[in-house]
Amino acid sequence: SLRDFNPDDKKLFVRIESPNEYPNYFFRNLDGELNQITYFANPFKSIQNVHKEVIKYKREDGLDLSATLYLPDGYNFSQKEKLPMIMWAYPREYKDKSSASQITKNPNQFTYPYAGSPLYWLTRGYAVLDNVAFPIVGEGNKQPNDDFRVQLVSNAKAAIDKVANLGYVDIDRIAVGGHSYGAFMVANLLSHSNYFAAGIARSGAYNRTLTPFGFQSEERNYWEAPQIYYNMSPFMHADKLKSPILLIHGEADNNSGTYPLQSERYFNALKGLGATARLVMLPKESHGYRAKESILHMLWEQDTWLENYVKNKKEIN
């Protein structure tokens, strides 16, 4: 990518990267000659050679969707072993289908795992479907959330159908995960579909009546659209939860839409109804987790959950 241009020296200042090459900076002259400026080493050697591709597919209503599929280093494409998979996503609202279908993923970007990334599980033998498109579309006078649940489940089905057709994934061992509004998505999917073996929901909101003056892109208040708030709230459908769910929340979350009460009350409802659920509260953490101890414990909790309820699901059953 171009960072600067010096017309007098006829030089470009550029950053060069690839899926397995850490970004570094160079001068490039108009003849194409490169002069490297930085020599940053790749700190993520364990996932340096994983397979990465942007996959494209269609939803039932014809909407074009995409996601980034990762397979572990050394995956044998001729044998096509069916792997457990983690799907990670975040729903977004749109007012037209063309905007919802835009592809913003670049397969040539360096594979950079952040603290809460699902990519670490590539080293544990999982496939990872990251940045999965989850558009919620409302065109004309229709608002996106008018059929939120239907579109949410349809997005999940389209992604699972695609990876199933590719032949890399065991569709009986798929987990779904998300943070914040992504956690809200997870709880809804586990309540209204049978596609997932387990879920991981971090710092989410599960009772929309506790955010009565709107949330995300929803501008209607509770009193204007009570049925929408009810239908979208996993808390109201806690009796329908079909798969084990891991709830993680910062004990000091001050984000107005995701106070810790959301996870605490949802967990109480799930346990009272006999669901398989675990609640982890991280001390002194807000909406995003910062302390090394918190991040490492979060990763341990997620790994334990995935190993028990996804990878080794058949052995447990």
Regions found by a protein language model. Name each.
Residues 98, 102-317:
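Active-site-proximal cap/loop segments of hydrolase catalytic domains
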Residues 16, 29, 41, 90, ...:
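Residues that line or immediately flank small-molecule/substrate-binding pockets and catalytic motifs
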Residues 1-78, 116, 123:
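Non-catalytic accessory segments flanking enzyme active sites
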Residues 75-77, 95, 254-255:
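Short beta-strands and strand-coil junctions in structured, solvent-facing domains, enriched
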Residues 51, 63, 83, 170, ...:
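Exposed loop/turn and edge beta-strand positions of beta-sandwich/beta-sheet ligand-binding modules
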Residues 71, 79-93:
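Short beta-strand element of the alpha/beta-hydrolase
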Residues 70, 88-89, 177, 248:
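Short hydrophobic segments within beta-strands
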